[in-house]
Amino acid sequence: MLTIISYFGLLLATLTFTIVLFVGLSKIQLI
């Protein structure tokens, strides 16, 4: 079960990083 929690945490961190990166690129292109 600990592996599932760790995997979910890693997936959540990756998703958050992707969203932040996408928003950052969008703001750069907007300017």
Curated annotation (Swiss-Prot):
Principal cellular location given in the protein's record: plastid
InterPro entries: Cyt_b6/f_cplx_su6 (IPR007802)
Keyword set, alphabetical order: Chloroplast, Electron transport, Membrane, Photosynthesis, Plastid, Thylakoid, Transmembrane, Transmembrane helix, Transport
Localization annotation: Plastid, Chloroplast thylakoid membrane
One of the record's GO cellular component terms: chloroplast thylakoid membrane
Top-rank taxon: Eukaryota
One MF term in the entry's GO annotations: electron transporter, transferring electrons within cytochrome b6/f complex of photosystem II activity
Gene Ontology biological process terms, A to Z: photosynthesis
Topology of the protein relative to the lipid bilayer: Single-pass membrane protein
Annotated transmembrane regions: 4-24
Entry keyword annotation includes Chloroplast: yes
UniProt record similarity statement: Belongs to the PetL family.
Function comment: Component of the cytochrome b6-f complex, which mediates electron transfer between photosystem II (PSII) and photosystem I (PSI), cyclic electron flow around PSI, and state transitions. PetL is important for photoautotrophic growth as well as for electron transfer efficiency and stability of the cytochrome b6-f complex.
Name of this protein: Cytochrome b6-f complex subunit 6
